[in-house]
């Protein structure tokens, strides 16, 4: 084995709090000034990674909105200990944590499109994993509501990944329960509440203290009452008279890299084919 096809991943955490603590900003990610600063930081990071790519031939680098499930709590806890007056996420007296990557504060808005309008300009600057989580209190009323939301996001925003993430609970006696129920409404016994911590669902009771505080602070999105304000797509009617089809010469291309073992296998298998 080798590391030839592995990426060196670079990310950031707590950009929202960087805006709060920066004396020349003093505002969170909902403010245009911190959004502008974040775009500049991410663009600088992209450029540096591009330089590294040229400086270290054969090495792969990517800019990712790293999950930071434990790091967002650990760094905030140590920073608070060293600098007691530092601004972390949440309110005074909360367990310290940092907002993940360049996300908005978790209590920002119940209107999902308000959040998407801001995140769309930031998440598209990452070159690797990034995701917008649509945290919902309960599941949507039916599949049509889910399909409608997915379509609106897909047609009006550029961000690459998003999740529909309702909260649900599990009772040992009665199984699945929609929404947050620490006690089963049917039998009164203790139930487990599940929510998405970063990229996957886990019982809230097993989260670290920082993520547990983040869960408490979340403002859930009210999808049914959210309003799409910026329509980014337009419909253009094209008739047959508008279209002129000209014959084009076609070629088959095989794109490979020098370090990919699968590319070498593909080239060997396709020997004799008319490829460029």
Predicted regions and their residues:
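Local sequence-structure signature of Cys/Sec-based thiol-disulfide redox active-site neighborhoods
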Residues: 243-275
